[in-house]
C-alpha cells in the first residue's frame, strides 16, 4: 500500500500546491500520462517547469524533482515528457507520483481562487452554525470536492459557487448552502403534546359530552 509523505520543501512552503498526478507510462520513450489538478495546464506545464514529487520513501524518486520538457495531448489526454525519464521502465517507476509546484513570487493572485492549504482547516458554516471542518480537497475534471469532517462522519461537498458561495480565509470560515440531503437536516422542534395525549384511556376531553 502506498503512503506518500508530502515533500519537506513543500511542507515548508505554504504557497505550494498540487498540479497533477502521474498515472502510467505511455509508449516506450519515457512519456507519462497525467491526471491534471489544474484548470490551466498551459500555464503550469510549460517546458522547464520544475515539480517536487510526492512519492513513498522507498521510491527511487524520493527527494528528487522533475523538469518538464514537453506536454502533449493524445486523444484529449495529457502526456508529459521529463528530463531524465528516457524509457518506459523509468516512466513506470513514476506511476502514482503527485506533482507539486510553487507559483512564481510575482504571480498575481487570481480572484476566487484558493490553494488547497488555504482551504484545509477552514470551519464550515451553514446558516451561521458550524457544521464541520474542511479536511481534504479532491480535484476532478468536472469539479473539486471538499471533504468536510462532521460529528457524524465525512461529507463530500462540491466546491461550486451555488453550494459554497463564500470563502473567507482570513476569518477561517467557509459558508455552504447545501441542497436537501447533502447534510442531515436539523430536526424540527418537537410539538407540544396536546391536551388529549395525557388523558386517561377511555376518558373524554374536557368540554365534550361523553358518548
UniProtKB/Swiss-Prot annotation:
It is found in: Cytoplasm. SUPFAM superfamilies: PRC-barrel domain, Translation proteins. One of its GO terms (cellular component) is ribosome. Keywords: Chaperone, Cytoplasm, Ribosome biogenesis, rRNA processing. The keyword NAD does not apply. Residues 184-211 are annotated as: Disordered. The PRC barrel domain binds ribosomal protein uS19. An accessory protein needed during the final step in the assembly of 30S ribosomal subunit, possibly for assembly of the head region. Essential for efficient processing of 16S rRNA. May be needed both before and after RbfA during the maturation of 16S rRNA. It has affinity for free ribosomal 30S subunits but not for 70S ribosomes. This is Ribosome maturation factor RimM. The gene is rimM.
